[in-house]
UniProtKB/Swiss-Prot annotation:
One of its GO terms (cellular component) is DNA-directed RNA polymerase complex. The lineage of its organism: Bacteria, Pseudomonadati, Pseudomonadota, Gammaproteobacteria, Vibrionales. Keywords: DNA-directed RNA polymerase, Magnesium, Metal-binding, Nucleotidyltransferase, Transcription, Transferase, Zinc. Its cofactor is Mg(2+); Zn(2+). Binds 1 Mg(2+) ion per subunit. Disulfide bonds: none annotated. Its EC number is 2.7.7.6. It comes from Vibrio vulnificus (strain YJ016). The RNAP catalytic core consists of 2 alpha, 1 beta, 1 beta' and 1 omega subunit. When a sigma factor is associated with the core the holoenzyme is formed, which can initiate transcription. It catalyses: RNA(n) + a ribonucleoside 5'-triphosphate = RNA(n+1) + diphosphate. Zn(2+) 2 binds at C814, C888, C895, C898. This is DNA-directed RNA polymerase subunit beta'. It comes from the Bacteria. The keyword Glycoprotein does not apply. Mg(2+) binds at D460, D462, D464.
Length: 1400
């Protein structure tokens, strides 16, 4: 028996391995895997159903069909194990060897492997340096290739057509050899000397100057070096032996009715074997060349189809015209091996059912139907029945359970106690889509779900289904309880806000409970406490909303945990006093002494969590829910048609609007306004009418007049049901009420444009046919969009997870000194996001000092929690540097200090936390809420008047940032720099507002001046760009010749004349090379110099510039010499919503990106070409840089102006690659984070910046080597950043020269495919390409990420699996080192001692 056990163990041998290597298989290797050659195409005998000998299912090669039984039946039973039957040749063993025993086919002629031939770039073509077309011609027998030139003038691997070949043959006879087919290619590959090739290419690389040649050489060099280093032989890319898949992996199943269902592979294999056998026969018969050639070509095609059907030519189809599924199709795509079976498997012990409400459950419970529980917990029940001695065998136990005896239910109760189950709702968009609950047995067949977790699951009870999974092992139960229990997931991992928040009925109930009513029954009573308030309410002495005075006892808990109480009389209502009874000790009464809407309740829970911790919050949340439901029921709030009150003002408003529209129509017909203006005005009128009607309706709904105690009339908030629902945030919004009781307003067409006839009716009055039809028009688009959006959002999430899956917190502190700067987001006059909100939960990278002093407020490496943030606020700090994942220095993953607080737990992140996946989920999950639209800016909807002044909103002082200016004769400042910013600073030095100042703005305040709110500080002309003089003097025109370079116009009304500079293209020949300019001279006629330089003040005028001054006029400093009209932005589409987020993460270049200065220096313009201008930047050292810029781009710089690297030269959307190259990593991180946040903020979705930073870190994973130093890298090669870092560290340690590099920004799809792990990349996209590349270069996958480990089927190196992997690595390191000398002596001594002691 013992050896049997050992034998069975031997079958399941799992090697502990650290890496997986992929390579090309040699023919000998394939033969060594094989258990025999498949010689016949037959499968099984149709009469006996036994496999044919030497066929595709042969039992002799692949193993027995039945366990421990040979085919002819001579040997049966276990005792003959391992015997090979002499009659049928079958080894007696288990059937399952048919799943892993392979066979092989000896090919009669070599065949090229289609992946290495056709998967671009063609590896065979690249290696031999022959175009793919030519290789294909050789392979498919259309051309000869010279394999041995001999003493002829032919070259090796030269192509010859049939005729050329015959000519040469006559000329030289058998002096040379030329062949066709895969044999020829195999010979050529076999005769390559890789080392010599490398030498030659390295020499060429040094000598060549052409960029394209260099690129090609580098590519080829990398491939050849890969072949050398991996030990792959190039001729293995040509197959001479074909492996045959084990038969149980390509089954043949008899169906009833004598037909068979078979895997497509069998057809493909059969085809190969038939052709191969025919070819063998033809070769034996020495058939004519043309026949043999045709057969060889057919063999090549059939092998191609087997490996990757449809890659070349038409796909081979089966009987039903459907292309056959080849080996390549088996592994790729959503239905392929990777995504279907390795990354997502179906699991046992699970069930699903419809969900329904469980309002009486506690937060950690769920209701599980008894029937389901009985089925799911069967094994536990069986074992309990057996250990109790209630059933003798498992079979008896099974019978008892099937009969559902009474004792079984008792045991089920016991088994279920404290055994959590997992509930999952598809689609699982973030980790809160699977949570653990303790089951409570219920009658019925629906799972009961706690209402508060619906938000996390995004579940509702309109027929949603959920799946139940049972964690079986003790470890799994422990993890479910400690990590996944719903009570441990109160905060959202995306933003750190509570996600267990009441909604709908509960909110309505609490809102109703905390409202107040004037002159309600019992107003003005004095009550001794909340209990007395409740008594008054229950005995109907006082109404729920009555305003009363109640004695309240508050508990204040200080930081050390000591609590003090204080008691006082408070003005409140009966309802609020009763609600106070369930609020846990330690919260102030003021927090419930207000009308509670959804926002306030969320805040209430947040406060509770931060002040009192998890347990109290969970209990409190449950109490809130029970109370909310109870009072929602008591409130009797419902929706009746009379609750929708239509304001009487509506009809007059509409009549007025119709009158205005009629007027505009008349103006249009008489030609006073254009069609576009008429449309815009009409839409404007209706939009404002709609707003006015809505306002009147809300005023009407939201307040009512009541008589107070003194008998006077007083306004109070209305108790109208619909108003209460919207006001509390339970259901509905002002916009929806507007449609019920106001007017529906303007409708959009599917393309986003607005229909100019609005729907004046509302739903209470009812729509007529036309109005209904207009409504349906836009609504259908909405439904179609939703379906698309779900798929797109899911795909975005998949790409994000794939790129970030291997970011895990691997160490506590990486020791970096870098970080990113954080400032509050300020737009114009308002703070969009406060600094404290951004900094909360981050670690400080540089000491934060008190502004204006050297006093350190917060030392570096402090985790900023709520208390520290309060200090930042109190000391009005407005700029701090915090650590960030982007600047983290860990080689793999990131460190805890750089990540900061784990948002879902509220403390520093634990090691092993899979922060990458969390980041991906947090960004992807709200994706379905984002719109798909690109917004058309056009029409009234959104054309704001162009800004032309800065009006400040706060008192404070002016501060100018990177501004150059001159002071004109009126004493105003005129800005002469580009990217100037005006900020308003309050008395604490905090930034309150930020405004951009264009070139040529005039300021009435100087730097440091005080301003008051409402003052206008700066103004400028909106649609023109001035040219400002920085010196005073007399104007002298240069090259400004009327009719040649300028054209003059005189205004009829004013009599003033102006000149317009003609575009270079439109000038007559004489003016082509002239450069019109305005020069300033002093009274003596000498050039005036620009202050601080030795350059004369000369201003070149671009085309279309308008000059209003005369030659010889006197000008002062800061005067305008000329104006250049700017085209207004026009109707640009802004990409919004989901597509915008995808574009940012894919790092796509915008259509017309902004042009940024590559270097700092002085601008000048060179010779122009037909469509482009030549911009020259002269750097400090005198070297110049040139760039050609299309003429239609508007430039922001003039001749002679100084620019800094990264300044904008021509406006447009900035390309992230440019930002990275010119302004560095911080700038690009900030750019992507802000742009992504912009989209989410519009939808009201809150996501923490660190998630976006985590993704950006992964996008910056690669870098390009600019200078190799003493490293192994090639210049221009793209390498993993961590590799370069490690290599440079080692080089520096040895005192050698490190490599220099530039960081690269990759889009997420590209970054996923460029990952080091080929397993992860192959399971993501483009499986064929990834695997081909990996095999050729003999890649090894160190299984670092999560995905690779899931695929090979072991614990992931994150979370609880992190420790397991760390232990394994430590053990492995120890094994490799071997025992030290000292240890060896100790071991020896111990052994000897043991030997002596046992002798006694």
């Amino acid at each position: 028996m013992k050896d049997l056990l050992n034998f069975l163990k031997a079958q399941h041998k799992t090697e502990e391995f650290d890496a997986i290597k992929i390579g090309l298989s040699s023919p000998d290797m394939i033969r060594s895997w094989s258990f025999g050659e498949v010689k016949k195409p037959e499968t099984i005998n149709y009469r006996t159903f036994k496999p044919e000998r030497d066929g595709l299912f042969c039992a002799r090669i692949f193993g027995p069909v039945k366990d421990y039984e040979c085919l002819c039946g001579k040997y049966k039973r276990l005792k003959h194990r391992g015997v090979i039957c002499e009659k049928c040749g079958v080894e007696v063993t288990q059937t399952k060897v048919r799943r892993d025993r392979m066979g092989h086919i000896e090919l009669a002629s070599p065949v090229a492997h289609i992946w290495f031939l056709k998967s671009l770039p063609s590896r065979i073509g690249l290696l031999m340096d022959i175009p793919l077309r030519d290789i294909e011609r050789v392979l498919y027998f259309e051309m000869y290739v010279v394999t041995e030139p001999g003493m002829t003038d032919l070259e090796k691997s030269q192509m010859l057509t049939e005729e050329e070949y015959l000519d040469r043959l006559e000329e030289w006879g058998d002096e040379f050899t030329a062949k066709m087919g895969a044999e020829a290619i195999k010979d050529l590959l076999g005769s390559m000397d890789l080392h010599a090739e490398v030498e030659q290419m390295r020499e060429e690389l040094d000598t060549t100057n052409s960029e394209t040649k260099r690129k090609k050489l580098t590519k080829r060099l990398k491939l050849v070096e890969a072949f050398i280093s991996s030990g792959n032989n190039p001729e293995w890319m040509i197959l001479t032996v074909l492996p045959v898949l084990p038969p149980d992996l390509r089954p043949l199943v008899p169906l009833d009715g004598g037909r068979f269902a078979t895997s497509d592979l069998n057809d493909l294999y059969r085809r190969v074997i038939n052709r191969n056998n025919r070819l063998k026969r033809l070769l034996e018969l020495a058939a004519p060349d043309i026949i043999v050639r045709n057969e060889k070509r057919m063999l090549q095609e059939s092998v191609d189809a087997l490996l990757d059907n449809g890659r070349r030519g038409r796909a081979i189809t089966g009987s039903n015209k459907r292309p056959l599924k080849s080996l390549a199709d088996m592994i790729k795509g959503k239905q392929g091996r990777f995504r279907q079976n390795l990354l997502g498997k179906r699991v046992d012990y699970s069930g699903r059912s419809v969900i329904t409400v469980g309002p009486y459950l506690r937060l950690h419970q769920c209701g599980l139907p008894k029937k389901m529980a009985l089925e799911l917990f069967k094994p536990f029940i069986y074992s309990k029945l057996e250990t109790r001695g209630l059933a003798t065998t498992i079979k008896a136990a099974k019978k008892m359970v099937e009969r559902e005896e009474a004792v079984v239910w008792d045991i089920l109760d016991e088994v279920i106690r404290e055994h959590p189950v997992l509930l999952n709702r598809a689609p699982t968009l973030h980790r809160l889509g699977i949570q653990a609950f303790e089951p409570v047995l219920i009658e019925g067949k629906a799972i009961q779900l706690h209402p508060l977790v619906c938000a996390a699951y995004n579940a509702d009870f309109d027929g949603d289904q959920m799946a139940v999974h049972v964690p079986l092992t003790l470890e799994a139960q422990l993890e479910a309880r400690t990590l996944m229990m719903s009570t441990n997931n109160i905060l959202s991992p995306a933003s750190g806000d509570p996600i267990i928040v009441p909604s709908q009925d509960v909110v309505l109930g609490l809102y109703y409970m905390t409202r107040e009513m004037i002159n309600a029954k019992g107003e003005g009573m004095y009550l001794a406490g909340p209990a007395e308030a409740e008594k008054a309410y229950r005995t109907k002495t006082a109404a729920l909303h009555a305003r009363v005075k109640v004695r309240i006892t508050e508990t204040v808990v200080d930081e050390d945990g000591h609590s003090t109480t204080e008691t006082k009389m408070v003005d409140t209502t009966i309802g609020r006093a009763m609600l106070w009874q369930i609020v846990p000790k330690g919260l102030p009464f003021s927090i419930v002494n207000q009308k509670l809407g959804k926002k306030q309740i969320s805040n209430l829970l947040n406060e509770a969590y931060r002040k009192l911790g998890l347990k109290d919050t969970v209990i409190f949340a449950d109490q809130i829910m029970y109370t909310g439901f109870a009072y929602a029921a008591l409130s009797g709030v419902s929706v009746g048609i009379d609750d929708m009150v239509v304001p009487p003002a509506k009809y007059t408003e509409i009549a007025e609007a119709e009158e205005e529209v009629r007027e505009i129509q008349e103006q249009y017909q008489s030609g006073l306004v254009t069609a576009g203006e008429r449309y815009n005005k009409v839409i404007d009128i209706w939009a404002s009418t709609n707003d006015r009607v809505a306002k009147a309706m809300m005023e009407n709904l939201s307040s009512e007049t009541v008589i107070n105690r003194d008998g006077e009339e007083e306004q109070q908030e209305s108790f109208n049901s619909i108003y209460m629902m919207a006001d509390s945030g339970a259901r509905g919004s002002a916009a929806q009420i507007r449609q019920l009781a106001g007017m529906r307003g303007l409708m959009a067409r599917p393309d986003g444009s607005i229909i100019e006839t609005p729907i004046t009716a509302n739903f209470k009055e009812g729509l007529n046919v036309l109005q209904y039809f207009i409504s349906t028009h836009g609504a259908r688009k909405g439904l179609a969009d939703t379906a698309l959006k779900t798929a797109n959002s899911g795909y975005l999430t998949r790409r994000l997870v794939d790129v970030a899956q291997d970011v895990v917190v691997t160490e506590h502190d990486c020791g970096t000194l870098e970080g990113v700067e954080m400032m509050p987001h300020i737009e114009g006059g308002d703070v969009k996001v406060a600094l404290t909100e951004l900094a909360l939960g981050r670690v400080v990278a540089e000491d934060i000092v008190k502004p204006g002093t050297e006093e350190i407020l917060i030392p570096r490496n402090t985790l900023l929690d709520e208390k520290w943030c309060q200090i930042i606020n109190d000391n009005s700090v407005d700029k701090i540097t915090v650590r960030s994942v982007v600047t983290c220095d860990s080689d793999f993953g990131c460190c805890a200090q750089c990540y900061g607080r784990d948002l879902a737990r509220g403390h520093l992140v634990n090691q092993g936390e899979a922060v990458g996946v969390i980041a991906a989920q947090s960004i992807g999950e709200p994706g379905t809420q984002l719109t798909m639209r690109t917004f058309h800016i056009g029409g009234a909807a959104s054309t704001a008047a162009a800004e032309n002044s800065v009006q400040v909103k706060n008192n404070g002082s002016v501060k100018l940032n990177n501004a150059k200016f001159v002071i004109n004769k009126d004493g105003k400042l005129v800005i002469t720099s580009r990217a100037s910013e005006l900020t308003i600073i309050d008395e604490f030095g905090r930034t309150k507002e930020k405004h951009k100042l264009p070139y040529g703005s005039s300021l009435s305040k100087a730097d440091g001046d005080a301003v008051t709110a409402g003052e206008t500080v700066a103004n400028w002309e909106a649609h023109t760009m001035p040219i400002i003089t920085e010196v005073a003097g007399r104007v002298q025109f240069v090259d400004m010749i009327d009719g040649v370079t300028v054209s003059r116009q005189t205004d009829d009304l004013t009599g003033l004349s102006s000149s317009e500079v003609t575009d270079a293209a439109a000038r007559p020949a004489a003016g082509k090379d002239m450069r019109p300019a305005i020069k300033l001279v002093d009274a003596a006629g000498n050039d005036v110099m620009i202050p601080g330089t030795d350059m004369p003040a000369q201003y070149f005028l671009p085309g279309k510039a308008i000059v209003n001054i005369e030659d010889g006029a006197e000008v002062g400093i800061g005067d305008t010499l000329a104006r250049i009209p700017q085209k207004s932005g026009g109707n640009k589409d802004i990409t919004g919503g989901l597509p915008r987020v995808a574009d940012l993460f894919e790092a796509r270049k915008p259509k017309e990106p902004a042009i940024l200065a590559e270097y700092s220096g002085t601008v000048s313009f060179g010779k122009e070409t037909k469509g482009k201008r030549r911009l020259i930047i002269t750097r400090e050292g005198g070297e110049t840089y040139e760039e050609m810029i299309p003429k239609h781009r508007q430039l922001n710089v003039f001749e002679g102006e100084r620019v800094e690297r990264g300044d904008v030269i021509a406006d447009g959307p900035e390309a992230p690659h440019d930002i990275l190259r010119l302004r560095g990593i911080h700038a690009v991180t900030q750019y992507i984070a802000n742009e992504v946040q912009e989209v989410y903020r519009l939808q009201g979705v809150k996501i923490n910046d660190k998630h976006i930073e985590t993704i950006v870190r992964q996008m910056l994973r690669k870098c390009t080597i600019t200078h190799a130093g003493d490293s192994e890298f090639l210049p221009g090669e793209t390498v993993e950043y961590s590799q370069v870092k490690i290599a440079n560290r080692n080089l520096e340690a040895e005192g050698k020269e490190p490599a220099r590099f530039e960081r690269e920004l990759l889009g997420i799809t590209k970054a996923s495919l460029a990952t080091e792990s080929f397993i992860s990349a192959a399971s993501f996209q483009e499986t064929t390409r990834v695997l081909t590349e990996a095999a050729v270069s003999g890649k090894r996958d160190d299984l670092r990420g999560l995905k690779e480990n899931v695929i090979v089927g072991r614990l992931i190196p994150a979370g609880t699996g992190f420790a397991y992997h760390q232990d394994r690595q430590a053990k492995r390191a120890q094994e490799q080192e071997g025992p030290s000398a000292a240890q060896a002596t100790d071991n020896l001594a111990a052994l000897l001692n043991a030997g002596f002691s046992s002798d006694e």
